[in-house]
């Protein structure tokens, strides 16, 4: 009976000790779980930092590759535009030189035509004057009844000579004017063709640069 009482007395203390041990075990498990979670979070943060570093390194490497390429493309485009401008200026100077040469040739030809036509016209006028004098002399030598016919012949001859002179002058002026219009239109057509070709080249360069820039920004 005394042993049973001792056991009954010790049983609450054992129960309390058991509870304390269970609480200690739970605390230990909680601490282990907390440490495990902390280690997991630390590893996750380290992995995230490593991934961020890798992304930054890759971004820097991509920038290091693309930036020189973009600068080179821009420099090439600027060089192409400068060359196109230089070609336009050279072509314009050549066209101006050709136009000046054509103007000089036209002036020389006009002078040569004048030099040729003026003596011819003077000779024709002199011949007309000589013909008129001869006709007057012939009329004076004709009898009185033939004077009217002589006057008609003289008037017809004078009209023929005047019409021929005017026709020659008109034909010469028309020839010079037609040649000048043809030369001018040919020079203007050549200049317009060169200007359009240079403009198309500049537009192609600009379109190429606009196509390349979005690709570069997408890489960055």
Swiss-Prot record:
Residues 1-22 have a biased composition (Basic and acidic residues). Gene3D superfamilies: 1.20.5.190. Residues 146-175 form the IQ domain. Keywords: Coiled coil. The lineage of its organism: Eukaryota, Metazoa, Chordata, Craniata, Vertebrata. This is IQ domain-containing protein F3. It comes from the Eukaryota. Residues 1-81 are annotated as: Disordered. Residues 23-50 have a biased composition (Acidic residues). Pfam families: IQ (PF00612). InterPro entries: IQ_motif_EF-hand-BS, IQCF. Residues 69-93 form a coiled coil.
């Amino acid at each position: 009976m005394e042993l049973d009482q001792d056991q009954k007395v010790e049983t609450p203390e054992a129960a309390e000790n058991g509870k304390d041990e269970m609480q200690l075990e739970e605390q230990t498990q909680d601490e282990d779980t907390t440490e495990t979670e902390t280690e997991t979070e630390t590893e996750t943060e380290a992995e995230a930092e490593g991934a961020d570093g890798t992304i930054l390194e890759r971004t820097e490497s991509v920038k290091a590759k693309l930036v020189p390429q973009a600068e080179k493309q821009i420099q090439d485009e600027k060089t192409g535009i400068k060359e196109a401008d230089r070609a336009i200026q050279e072509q314009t100077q050549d066209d101006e030189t050709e136009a000046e040469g054509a103007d000089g040739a036209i002036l020389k030809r006009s002078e040569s035509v004048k030099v040729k036509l003026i003596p011819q016209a003077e000779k024709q006028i002199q011949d007309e004057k000589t013909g008129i004098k001869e006709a007057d002399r012939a009329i004076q030598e004709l009898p009185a009844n033939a004077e009217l016919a002589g006057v008609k012949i003289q008037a017809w001859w004078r009209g023929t000579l005047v019409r021929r002179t005017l026709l020659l002058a008109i034909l010469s002026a028309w020839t010079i004017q037609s040649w000048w219009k043809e030369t001018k239109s040919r020079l203007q057509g050549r200049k317009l063709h060169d200007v359009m070709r240079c403009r198309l080249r500049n537009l192609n360069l600009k379109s190429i640069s606009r196509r390349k820039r979005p690709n570069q920004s997408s890489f960055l």
